[in-house]
């Protein structure tokens, strides 16, 4: 009945109902955001990693904190992984969200860190929450199935800043939209960049990247710190700068900020390398990249790490059903440009025909083709409907110094095969099984 009523209502009406729900939840739990300092992180990509980095920085500084992200919930030192895709909403409904904040308060946490999506902002899910610090990471092609235009998408992100004029702002100056956020009133504004000097915030200099991580100098108003990240890729340097600026905004010791960033290990399903045996002579990486910009960043990071190895990049990818269809051929084109072998496969089709989704992604491969490579079906690219079989095919094709890159699902442990139907599926588990079958288990 609730679904029938929901379909009959306009989005505007539903948003007003969400606002009422948020007010009630806020009242029920005693307005918890006034008893804890809330940090909100929004942007197309990097939100989960930035949240985990901020939590690590606060831990290093001895500040009790809680966190709610796509992949995990944290209350002080107790972590809970999110494995059910029906639970995998970046920003939960108001009742759940206010309950989480209340638990954080009851646990004695001083800070709470929240991932905040554009949909959550548009739908008033965070209405009534008082944010102490808000972060903008970036804006790129995604979620146009919901917002229709990139301007609407941007306007939704801006709400987090517009609604919190007394908060501290942390903004990525390398993003083309940075000034739309910076122009809004705030108690204090911090910028970060890997490209240009900034007036107040942090900039990365002397960046050295490898497949195992990145080292850079974070230069800020009162000094500098050499940070050795365990996470690879320039995009993770940007993520680290965002967390560094949050630490500065909160008045933390820069040495504690540095320590917290250096303590961050790979986030599950984010550039996660899987190895089962010392005999394994190629790499397998699982990553959540599910939009063009994230996919491009991952491809570039992997390619950078493969320089002079002579190995092939074998890409396994698809696209989610019921989401922005315009990005599907773009992702296929990126695969055509960066990869040597490509396997297009199923990825959370919901109620769409998975074969049709695969066709829409695969048609882009020719647009991304480089002159030295001609794409031929069943010779250097394949369409494999069964995702487990696609992973099997990729690992079978892999040889010495190759990299198998599996994108789209990250650490998720279910696949959405209809609107409300989820079946168990884990890229990571399938990869481990395939590698054990080929190399045996170490130990």
Where in the sequence are the language-model features?
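Short acidic, glycine/proline-rich loop/turn micro-motifs
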Residues: 77-85, 229, 416-420
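Short, conserved phosphate/pyrophosphate- and ester-handling motifs at nucleotide-, phospho-/glycolipid
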Residues: 48, 239, 287-291
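Acidic, Mg2+-coordinating active-site environments of NTP-dependent enzymes
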Residues: 34-36, 107, 131-284, 369-377, ...
């Amino acid at each position: 009945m609730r679904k029938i009523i929901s379909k009959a209502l306009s989005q505007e009406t539903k948003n007003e109902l969400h606002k009422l729900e948020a007010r009630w939840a806020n009242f029920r739990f005693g307005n918890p955001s006034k008893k804890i300092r809330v940090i909100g992180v929004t942007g197309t990509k990097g939100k989960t990693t930035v949240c985990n980095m901020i939590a690590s920085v606060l831990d290093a500084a001895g500040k009790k904190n809680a966190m709610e992200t796509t992949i995990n919930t944290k209350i002080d030192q107790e972590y809970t992984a999110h494995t059910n895709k029906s639970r995998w909403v970046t920003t939960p409904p108001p009742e759940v969200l206010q309950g989480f904040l209340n638990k954080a308060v009851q646990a004695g946490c001083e800070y709470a860190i929240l991932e905040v999506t554009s949909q959550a902002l548009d739908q008033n899910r965070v209405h009534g929450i008082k944010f102490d610090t808000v972060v903008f990471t970036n804006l790129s092609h995604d979620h146009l199935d919901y917002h229709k235009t990139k301007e609407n998408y941007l306007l939704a992100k801006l709400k987090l800043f517009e609604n919190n004029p007394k908060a501290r702002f942390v903004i990525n100056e390398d993003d083309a939209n940075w000034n739309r956020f910076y122009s809004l009133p705030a108690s204090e504004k911090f910028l970060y960049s890997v490209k240009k000097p900034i007036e107040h915030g942090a900039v990365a200099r002397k960046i050295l990247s490898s497949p195992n991580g990145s080292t850079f100098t974070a230069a800020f108003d009162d000094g500098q710190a050499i940070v050795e990240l365990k996470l690879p890729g320039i995009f993770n340097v940007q993520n680290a700068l965002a967390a560094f600026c949050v630490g500065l905004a909160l008045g933390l010791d820069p040495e504690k900020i540095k320590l917290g960033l250096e303590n961050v290990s790979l986030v599950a399903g984010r550039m996660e390398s899987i190895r089962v045996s010392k005999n394994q002579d190629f790499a397998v990486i699982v990553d959540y990249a599910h939009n063009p910009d994230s996919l491009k960043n991952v491809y570039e990071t992997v390619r950078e790490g493969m320089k002079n190895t002579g190995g092939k990049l074998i890409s396994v990818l698809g696209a989610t059903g019921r989401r922005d269809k315009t990005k599907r051929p773009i992702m296929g084109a990126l695969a055509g440009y960066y990869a040597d072998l490509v396997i297009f496969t199923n990825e959370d089709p919901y109620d769409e025909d998975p074969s049709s989704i695969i066709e829409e992604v695969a048609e882009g491969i020719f647009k991304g083709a480089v002159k030295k490579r001609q794409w031929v079906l069943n010779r250097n690219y394949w369409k494999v409907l069964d995702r487990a079989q696609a992973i099997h095919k990729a690992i079978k094709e892999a040889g010495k110094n190759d990299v198998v890159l599996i994108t789209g699902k990250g650490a998720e442990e279910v696949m959405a095969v209809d609107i409300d139907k989820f079946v168990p599926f884990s890229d990571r588990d399938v990869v481990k099984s395939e590698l054990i079958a080929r190399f045996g288990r170490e130990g």
